[in-house]
């Protein structure tokens, strides 16, 4: 006896074909930037002295991990057209821009590869944020409000 199983798996980030290309590009850029941040953080972690107190370090890492999970969730919700996710991601992009500009004026640009990659990542996030603010993207997000 043969049993036929029917399963429909949908692994596509964009369920609709109506998603503007600017939103698709912005989501891809944000995923890449988040991945680059995780790698940069891992590389910077190697330079920390582990003789320091562990309780504050665990607290900071736990808080950062929570923020990263929420950021990943917000990026995933962008592809579904959630306006709140767009606002959260735009706010985090603005925060990254402000902190990067402050760091550049306070410390200057170091020639370390990790700093240059971070600057390029923030520039890419800025472009992605501008993609989310185009007229087509804004109209698409507003059309998703129920």
What are these regions (language model features)?
Residues 1-146:
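Topology signature of small-to-medium multi-pass alpha-helical membrane proteins
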